[in-house]
UniProtKB/Swiss-Prot annotation:
Record-annotated site: Interaction with substrate tRNA: T102
Species of provenance: Lactococcus lactis subsp. cremoris (strain MG1363)
The enzyme's E.C. designation: 2.5.1.75
Annotated region described as Interaction with substrate tRNA, given as residue ranges: 36-39
InterPro entries tied to this protein: Dimethylallyltransferase, IPT, P-loop_NTPase
Amino-acid positions noted as binding ATP in the UniProt annotation, renumbered to this chain: G11, P12, T13, A14, V15, G16, K17, T18
Residues bound to substrate: T13, A14, V15, G16, K17, T18
Identification of the protein by name: tRNA dimethylallyltransferase
Disulfide bonds: none
Gene Ontology BP terms: tRNA modification
Length: 294
């Protein structure tokens, strides 16, 4: 029987997913598939914390630099491409390793969502936030109106059911054919937020402002321009705010995004988180992965 095992590394921005993914790829004969919605764009290297050329030389990476700034990349595109790549990687006898923090991408792949190519990412996020804010009673009331015989009333299944009613197929056989091991990375909030702030300062020293200005001048309305680390500078380029304020916006929005990422993975997916500052990390991860693959 053909191996169908896939590793998935998730967690908030700046927690260390890239480093772990590369370590796993080296140790487990793996190839990395990026699960980041911004790293698909060519030339947006600094603000997306894209893997460097040196890092890419250590392990094979996929779905990096596959779109121009003016091109869109949807959840549907990701699921189609990721499934194709997983199949090819397994055929080569290697281990597919999904690494990224875009929760909607990861969940859609794992649960086999059939979202149309024209799906609206923003609408999906807004619906998710609305459903998460409901009480159990309110949530289950919505579900039972649509399906009085809904088999199991738990929040995760109820939310998924309502999203599928709105955005995709509810075919019970639409799940993925692969066996996924989810590895979640996290750190104490204060420490994580400090790492985020430091990363933004490092990005500034590496030329983030120039990268953002180029995007502002050439493709300000593109999907690529909506990412954190770019859009915050547009008011500065227009003379509306100071550079200092723009940098603080990047830091604030990055911290808020990290919080949303954690909320998504905790509420939507079966993830066991590893503290990246634990004495047993990363050996604890390698042990889990070895057991899973064997």
């Amino acid at each position: 029987m053909k191996n169908n095992k896939v590793l998935v590394v998730v967690g908030p921005t700046a927690v260390g997913k890239t480093a772990l993914g590369i370590d796993l790829a080296i140790k487990m004969n793996g190839e990395i598939i990026s699960g980041d919605s911004q790293q698909v764009y060519q030339g947006l290297d600094i603000g997306t914390a894209k893997v460097t050329k040196a890092e890419q030389a250590l392990a094979v990476h996929h779905l990096i630099d596959v779109r121009k700034w003016t091109e869109n990349f949807s959840v549907h595109d990701f699921v189609m491409e990721a499934n194709r790549l997983i199949e090819e990687i397994i055929e080569r006898g290697n281990v597919p390793i999904i690494v990224g923090g875009t929760g909607l991408y990861i969940q859609s792949l794992i649960e086999g969502y059939h979202l149309g190519g024209q799906e609206n990412h923003q609408a999906m996020m807004e619906l998710r936030e609305t459903l998460l804010a409901l009480t159990d009673e309110e949530l289950f009331e919505k579900v039972l109106k649509l399906n009085p015989n809904f088999p199991e009333l738990n929040r995760r299944r109820a939310i998924r059911f309502l999203e599928l009613q709105t955005f995709g197929s509810t075919d019970e056989n639409s799940g993925s054919d692969y066996n996924f091991l989810l590895i979640g990375l996290n750190a104490e909030r204060k420490v994580l937020y400090e790492r985020i702030n430091q990363r933004v300062e490092q990005m500034m020293s590496e030329g983030l402002l120039s990268e953002a200005r180029s995007l502002f001048e050439k493709a300000p309305d593109a999907q690529a321009a909506k990412g954190i680390g770019y859009k915050e500078f547009f008011p500065y380029f227009s003379g509306e705010i100071s550079l200092e304020d723009a940098v603080e916006l990047v830091k604030r929005n990055s911290r808020r995004y990290a919080k949303r990422q954690l909320t998504w993975f905790r509420n939507r997916m079966e993830v066991e988180f590893e503290d990246v500052f634990s004495e047993t990390y990363p050996d604890s991860v390698f042990e889990k992965v070895t057991q899973f693959l064997n």
